[in-house]
Amino acid sequence: MKSALCIALALTWSLLVQAARQTVLAVADHDIGGYSTFLQSLTDRDFDVKTSYIKDESAKLFEYGERLYDNLILLSSQSKSLGPVFSPKSLLEFVQSGGNLFVVAGSQLPEGIRELGRQLDMFLAERQSVVVDHFNHAEGSDDIILLDGISENPYIISDETRAAGPILYKGIGHYLGPNPQTQPILRGNPTSYIYNTKTEAEVSKNPWAAGTQLFLVSVLQSSTGERVGLSGSIDMLKDEYLSPQSPSFSKSNFLFARDLTNWVFQRKGVLQATNMTYGKVAEPLESRNASCYRIKDEMIFSIDISLLEDGQQTPYVADDVQLELIMLDPYYRVNLVPVPSDSQTSQHYEAVLVAPDHYGDFTFKIEYKRPGLTPIEEKSTFTLRQFFHNEFPRFLPHAYPYYASCFSVLGAFLLFCGIWLLQKPAKPVVPSAKKQN
């Protein structure tokens, strides 16, 4: 009996752990065995990794309208099409349903990836193009270039990666449109440019893109937090550069791939807002978040914000988190103040304000968006009412002049009446009679 109970508990625990792990589907159009180090690094970070062939008819992203995977990696270097399962439309639906997508393509990329990039405002160069640099390259090859134009955003790329040295890159490039949700992670050198090996001579006179406006790795984050990564180098993730046993091992490439996948798969740079409360100052916590308050009440708003870093919750401390109190237009826009608390996983913020002298439906709203961080959009609606008849003060300060005039008129009237009543009337003068002769 005890052994059966132990087995049942063990199975239940394993299922819970399995459910908590993020699932990753790695899809390739070629032998995926050359990415064993990269895929193993995902497994070491507690991702549940599965692999598939890009034209496998049994592969699917959805079942009964539900997304089957949390994250998708698309590795394409030789196929001319993505197949029906992984078409640009299906990939966009996967992202819109809450999934994260990491696209890695080489110079022989299919047109479907270029179409997907155009949908995201990431414009990839033509097939058979390659990025070259005649001044910053690995020994013996102009198309294996050394790059140090790494993003300075600390929420995406760590200081350790930036200090590890230049990135080895061999592949295609792209440029970005005006979409504010996209940002470059790896730029070209001032001497880098795109070269089409099929249509151009050994040196391109009019390159498609060049210099620091040539982007090699870029990311996109939607307004609801879904993330997409795009890399133009399929070789960057191969064992040739990521395996410590390889003579071409690059620590900077290994760290770069780790940071990039951690961000795209939402293991870092994820903000979470919890415990949003509001109420009157000195009101018990259990009485907060009521549906109705009174105008001119002194109110307090509080919220806890945490930052996910390498899968661990940490306090997020900032001085630019703003709170708005809105009824059509903001009545207040104030900065939330970080307040010390006992929590080791989140930062407590507070703001104190006086409710407007205007009744109606109001909304507390926080809208916080920063590059590299998932957006925070929290709001709660409540009603502000007028004073009840027994809540008005006995005397209003603004009415003091009217009170004074009223009492002064009353006093003057009483004084007049008193004077009039107390004043003795004068005796009438009787004229004397004239003597008769």
Curated annotation (Swiss-Prot):
Pfam assignment, any one: OST48_MD
Glycosylation sites (chain numbering): 275, 289
Compartment(s): Endoplasmic reticulum; Membrane
Membrane topology (Lumenal): 20-401
Signal peptide range in chain numbering: 1-19
Transmembrane segments: 402-422
Record's comment describing the protein's domains: The cytoplasmic C-terminal domain contains a functional dilysine-retrieval motif, which is involved in the retrograde Golgi-to-ER transport of the protein.
Role, per record: Subunit of the oligosaccharyl transferase (OST) complex that catalyzes the initial transfer of a defined glycan (Glc(3)Man(9)GlcNAc(2) in eukaryotes) from the lipid carrier dolichol-pyrophosphate to an asparagine residue within an Asn-X-Ser/Thr consensus motif in nascent polypeptide chains, the first step in protein N-glycosylation. N-glycosylation occurs cotranslationally and the complex associates with the Sec61 complex at the channel-forming translocon complex that mediates protein translocation across the endoplasmic reticulum (ER). All subunits are required for a maximal enzyme activity.
Subunit structure: Component of the oligosaccharyltransferase (OST) complex.
Name of the protein this chain belongs to: Dolichyl-diphosphooligosaccharide--protein glycosyltransferase subunit wbp1
